[in-house]
């Protein structure tokens, strides 16, 4: 005969907080074990990239608070908040903007020297 199962908690509905799995006890009984909700890794701060950040543990917020800092970020500029591709693009953009400023300054200096002659 099949053993009947009952929830161990008061909630009797199939909600996300009431998910269970079957487990066999040493006394050969089958009981419900309550499973924890799965966490999600954070998204990139840029808002453009669709995926989740790599190298960061995907856990619930309460567990994330208890983790050490090495498990919450990667050792890179903007590690733990932006993905590597976005950081690379941001560095390139900043470099090109600085180069453009230098070019403008040089052109202005050349124009000044032309007027002086």
Swiss-Prot record:
Gene3D superfamilies: 6.20.340.10, 6.20.370.70. Keywords: Cytoplasm, Endoplasmic reticulum, Ribonucleoprotein, Ribosomal protein. The keyword Ubl conjugation does not apply. It is found in: Cytoplasm, Cytosol; Cytoplasm; Endoplasmic reticulum. GO terms for biological process: translation. GO terms for molecular function: structural constituent of ribosome. Its main location: cytoplasm. One of its GO terms (cellular component) is ribosome. Component of the large ribosomal subunit. The ribosome is a large ribonucleoprotein complex responsible for the synthesis of proteins in the cell. Component of the large ribosomal subunit. Belongs to the eukaryotic ribosomal protein eL34 family. This is Large ribosomal subunit protein eL34. It comes from Ictalurus punctatus (Channel catfish).
